[in-house]
Structure formats: C-alpha cells, structure tokens
Amino acid sequence: MTKTPTLKEIFYNLQNQMIQKLSTDRKIIFHSPTKGGATELNWIDWLKKYLPNRYQVDQAFIVDSNGRFSEQMDLVIYDQQYSPFVFNQDGAIFIPAESVYAVFEIKQDLDKANFEYASDKIKSVRLLNRTSAPIVLASGRIDNPKKPFQILGGILTLTTTWQDVFGEPFQKAISETDKISRIDMGCCLEKGSFLIKYESDTYSFETSSDDESLIYFFLKLLSKLQELGTVPALDINAYGRALDSI
C-alpha cells in the first residue's frame, strides 16, 4: 500500500522544489538583472498558486491619491475588492496604496546591505497617503471608514552570507531601522524564516528551522494577512481630484 504523505512532507518537497529552481537560476543565469527577475517570478508564481484567491500577487509600483509613487516593489500582495484602480501598462503595474496588504523585497542573499535596501523600499510604500471611505454591504451602509493598517513588509532570499543567520548582525540590522522602515517577516529558504514583533522601542523575534522555512513563512504570512482583515475602501473622489474636470 502506498503511504500517504504527511503535511510536513508535502511542504518539505515544495521547499526543495523552490530551492532547486532558485539555485539552478543562480548557477545558470549569469546576467544579474535577468537572474533577479527569474527569482522574483518564482516567488510571485508560488504565492499566486497557494494564497487564497482574494489575494492578488504582482511586482508593482504603489501610487497614492496625491500622485506620489513608491519605488518598484518586487512582490506586492493586494486586494481589488474595494480598490478597483489597478493599471497594467505594458507589464508595469500600478496599484493604489489603499489596496496593499504587504510588500516584499526579493534578493539572492540575506545580509546587511539587502536588509537595509528592503527597509528603504518598504518605507517608500508606507509613506504614501491612504484614504478610507464608507462602504455599503447587504446589511447596510458602514459610515465609519476603516482606519488603514500598517502595511506588512518583508524580505525573501535563497540563502545568506551571515554565518550565524539570526545572530548579532541580524539583530543589529533590526535595531537600526526606524519605525516606518521596519521589516516584519522574511524567508531565507536554505536557512530558516523569521517573524519580528515590535513593542514600542523594543522587539522580539521567532525563527524556524532550516527544513521548515517555507511552511513556517507561508503559515505566518497567512496568519498576519488574516489579522489585517480587509483593506479599506479607497476614496474615489480623492483620486478623481487629480483630474481637472472632476
């Protein structure tokens, strides 16, 4: 009789497949931008496949009602239910800030430079203005607009150059980021994943083992997305004011 695989074995195999894909790209693709693009596409495709359908996943720029843009984000998790303005111009995707749940920077290695780079890009999103408008449900109109939550920020890598993955250099990088630049979570596929919890001016973090990095990251991401609930409805009139005729 064929043995039924356990949930852990299924995720372990998915993790090995992902590591194999990214490692092969790293070895074979010598052009750095092309290599980076392939890595980003692998992460986007994986999350598109396994996240619930309510969550959209793409590489994108984030825009607000004041006409300001973030840097291009490697991976954006967003919702179109109450924020319908998502533009795709020849592959360049523009998403309103109100519809964003989370943004991730994707790199080959987890190290100080990439951690700081990811923090700066996350900050460029969190600095954008987000509106919130009343919504109408089958049960009636909700007149108290939902307060925008802090967008999740993270980093995804294949491996790390830190000998002690979550040791002193990692902790120093966390402590040196300001509140708006904070990284909440990340996955280093070959070495483990992490979730950081902030309280006032202090923080704590938890990590996974190296053989559970993907399942740990995925389940923690799902949990954080559930905690956020639904994105606020954007104020369509605020965006309309960008046009002279409205």
What is each model feature region?
Residues M1-Q72, I77-I246:
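Intrinsically disordered, low-complexity Ser/Thr/Pro/Gly-rich regulatory segments
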